[in-house]
């Protein structure tokens, strides 16, 4: 969703504006297309998604991922000044909180069952 937001924000930008925003190399390789990568330019990979087949370990990993996503959305909110960007970020941040709480409930249930 963040890649889509960035794509929408740059769709009408000139090449000069992209260069001034530090997106010159991104434009060189990908134009204004969506290319999910982190702030250092490292592309997304499915290797980030891990599962070991143990419900407790997997749920803890899921909860950790939700908290990291929440923190990232908070960092993006701190940088944002456009209400059309802020509102979706607030929604996405809240979604991470809800996901974390659901994973936590399931984690607690598995622990109570002796896993």
What kind of feature is each model-predicted range?
Residues 1-115:
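Non-heme di-metal
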């Amino acid at each position: 969703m963040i890649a889509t937001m960035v794509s929408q924000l740059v769709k009408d930008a000139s090449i000069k504006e992209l260069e001034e925003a530090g997106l010159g190399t991104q434009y060189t390789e990908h134009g204004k297309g969506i290319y999910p990568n982190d702030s250092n330019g490292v592309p997304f990979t499915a290797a980030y998604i891990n599962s070991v087949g143990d419900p407790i370990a997997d749920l803890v990993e899921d909860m950790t991922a939700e908290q990291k996503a929440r923190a990232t959305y908070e960092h993006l909110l701190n940088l944002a000044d456009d209400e059309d960007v802020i509102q979706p970020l607030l929604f996405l941040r809240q979604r991470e909180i809800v996901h974390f709480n659901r994973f936590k409930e399931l984690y607690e249930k598995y622990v109570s069952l002796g896993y």
